[in-house]
Amino acid sequence: MPKISNYIGVDLSKEVINYCKNSINYEWATFARGYQPPYKVDFTILSGTLNYAVTDRVELWEKQVLNCLEKCWEKSCVSLIFNLQVCKNVSWISDDKIYFAEPNRMKEICENKFGKTTYISNTLLPDDGTFVVLRGN
């Protein structure tokens, strides 16, 4: 197995960061509170980060999502990878504040802002989609 050189886990939740700092003891892993990596990294992977909306207004939440992606993209040297809950037609936010993105539109937005973007879906997880944005394409 290849050696991992370093890992930084970033989260907004103080509780999550404290748990990780106190429970995970790898010399190559550090944890920080924030919206994006505190320094340049090869890969930024956001898993579930953008799914929980703090508003019921889709356009407002999508601005927040794109703002977060832009900040992470600035720190990503190779790739930005993120997943979202997805829907077939129009982006929406559920009653319990889960954001569902229309994947073709999100892919187009990412391609216009960042460059080559691949959308990955799996029939086993029909409401989940992963977006992979690569630099230098």
Whereabouts are the PLM-identified features?
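Conserved acidic residues
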Residues: 41-42, 78
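Conserved beta-strand signature within the Rossmann-like core of class I S-adenosyl-L-methionine
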Residues: 69, 73-86
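Class I SAM-dependent methyltransferase SAM/SAH-binding core
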Residues: 1-37
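A short SAM/SAH-binding and catalytic strip from SAM-dependent methyltransferases
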Residues: 42-62
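Class I S-adenosyl-L-methionine
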Residues: 91-137
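Charged helix-capping and loop-helix junction motifs
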Residues: 59-68, 99-102
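Short "lid" loop at the C-terminus of a central beta-strand within the Rossmann-like core
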Residues: 51, 84-90
